[in-house]
Structures are given as structure tokens and as C-alpha cells.
Regions:
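A structural boundary/capping signal
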Residues: 1-170
Length: 170
């Protein structure tokens, strides 16, 4: 089965230039398809109770939900950003979910706020982040989310400065 998300990124990489092209090319380099499982398969009933209480899972709040889950279990859970297909429509949107115990991906927002079967959606992960990284980016940006975009912007600035230094040496 083809991945519509990555096909879209490939297309955007061909029609853009400069920073945008570099962004899509980097996304394609970092991208890996993943499969989510039900949170019930990973967490105990007691842990799920704590999750529902602490995370306050709501529609359109995936970044906050994933951030809170990573903070609730910092030794077990990482925050993941990428894209996922919108249930019932099949096109990708920027999204956040979690990696548990280094091997199980869970999407509390799709599973509990949207009541979707997470095993049937396409997911493309860009990177998994520990709580120190997501806290730092959230404090800097004053919002949840856009960790990948923020770190890419930092990388792009450093890369541009490095190229400028190298050109000045010539």
C-alpha cells in the first residue's frame, strides 16, 4: 500500500525551493512509517485511569495530550511528531502521539477523543522526543507542538551560518 503522506511530501519537495524544499527533503529523510496499537494493549487499567484524569483528552488537542502523556510517564513515554491520515478522509495532517517503552506507538487523541481504530490509519513519524526536549521547546514557543519544525529551523540557521563561514574562507 502506498503512503499518501510521503507521496504528498515528495510532491511538495519538487514544487518548492529554498527553505521549504529543504524542510520537505529533511522530513522525507527522517520519516518512517509506524503502526499504532490501542493504549489498552500497553497500559494497565490503573494507568489508563491516571491518563484520562491527567491528560484530559480532547479533539484538536493532540499536541497537548501527547505532551502530557510524556510528562506523566517520563521514563516510559516519548513524544512523537509527524503526520497521520484523518480518519475517514485519508489525507495527512500534522499530528502528535506517543512511543511507549521504546516499541509501542499509541494515539490517545484518535483513539479516545475521536473514537477511531488507530490500527487502521497511516502514520509517518519524524522523531520521538524526551520530556526535556519537549519542555524546552514548549517554554520557548509558549505552545505545545511544532517541536520538529522548531528544531529544523534551528538546524537550518546553523547550516546557513556554516555555509556562510565556509564561503568566507574561500
Amino acid at each position: 500500500m502506498s503512503n499518501t503522506i510521503m507521496e504528498q511530501w515528495k510532491f511538495f519537495a519538487t514544487i518548492t525551493d529554498g527553505y521549504q524544499r529543504a524542510y520537505y527533503e529533511r522530513k522525507l529523510k527522517d520519516a518512517h512509517e509506524i503502526k499504532c496499537v490501542s493504549a489498552r494493549d500497553v497500559f494497565t487499567p490503573q494507568e489508563l485511569e491516571r491518563i484520562f484524569l491527567y491528560c484530559q483528552i480532547e479533539k484538536r488537542m493532540c499536541y497537548r495530550t501527547a505532551y502530557r502523556l510524556a510528562n506523566l510517564f517520563p521514563d516510559r513515554v516519548k513524544y512523537v511528531e509527524g503526520e497521520a491520515t484523518i480518519p475517514k478522509f485519508g489525507f495527512g495532517v500534522e499530528h502528535a502521539w506517543n512511543l511507549v517503552d521504546g516499541e509501542h506507538y499509541v494515539d490517545l487523541t484518535f483513539e479516545y477523543a475521536l473514537h477511531e481504530d488507530v490500527t487502521k490509519e497511516q502514520y509517518v513519524a519524524l522523531s520521538a522526543y524526551d520530556v526535556d526536549t519537549i519542555r524546552s521547546v514548549a517554554a520557548r514557543n509558549q505552545v505545545y507542538g511544532n517541536v520538529y519544525g522548531t528544531l529544523f529551523a534551528d538546524w537550518a540557521k546553523q547550516d546557513k551560518a556554516k555555509k556562510k563561514r565556509n564561503n568566507n574562507k574561500k
